[in-house]
């Protein structure tokens, strides 16, 4: 596969040799971070949702692996990730008191930790957790930011992508923004549209 402005680095043969889903997530992340046209150093984050065995109950549970706070996806390793019980993370909406209390939600992420060796979860964790997709990439490509920061960014996004990329206006990253991303996906699905991504106003691309 060839692209005009970015390099397509994915190697099907190499990916096929990676049997562990978390390792494959790391491989994907490193490729995205290798091209600074896709995201700036230290910017963006990636995630994968997998099924794993709960060490206490032995039951299969859904776990989300995500780049931890800080770090760079281009050099990401497993030790730089956070792994969280997805059901616990999503249940935090039951105690969410509103946008004025975003900071207290970050502390509650620690109650959702699955892997005790996890790095601290980032403020973007709910943005990934509330979306229903297995693989999620959040990047800051210069081209996307040019659209996201434009005065008519929403209109430009609709015209360029024909409704396949949603739009959510700028808001500080955190729990409330995660709920807005989910609402954007839900609204599109109610119209029979499956979004391929979401443009975040003055921010970047999901």
Where are these regions (language model features)?
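Glycine-rich flexible loops
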Residues: 1-206
């Amino acid at each position: 596969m060839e692209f005009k402005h970015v390099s397509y680095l994915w190697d099907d043969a190499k990916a096929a040799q990676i049997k562990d889903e978390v390792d494959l997530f790391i491989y994907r992340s490193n490729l995205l971070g290798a091209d600074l046209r896709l995201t700036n150093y230290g910017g963006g984050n990636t995630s994968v949702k997998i099924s794993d065995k709960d060490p206490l109950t032995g039951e299969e549970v859904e776990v989300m692996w995500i780049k931890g706070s800080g770090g760079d996806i281009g050099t990401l390793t497993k030790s730089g990730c956070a792994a969280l019980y997805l059901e616990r993370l999503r249940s935090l909406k039951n105690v969410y008191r509103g946008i004025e209390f975003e900071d207290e939600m970050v502390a509650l992420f620690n109650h959702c930790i699955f892997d005790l060796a996890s790095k601290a979860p980032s403020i973007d964790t709910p943005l990934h957790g509330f979306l229903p997709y297995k693989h999620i990439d959040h990047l800051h490509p210069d081209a996307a930011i040019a659209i996201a920061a434009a005065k008519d960014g929403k209109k430009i996004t609709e015209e360029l992508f024909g409704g396949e990329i949603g739009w959510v206006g700028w808001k500080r990253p955190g729990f409330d923004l995660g709920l807005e991303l989910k609402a954007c996906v839900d609204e599109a699905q109610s119209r029979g549209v499956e979004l391929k991504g979401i443009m975040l106003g003055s921010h970047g691309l999901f």
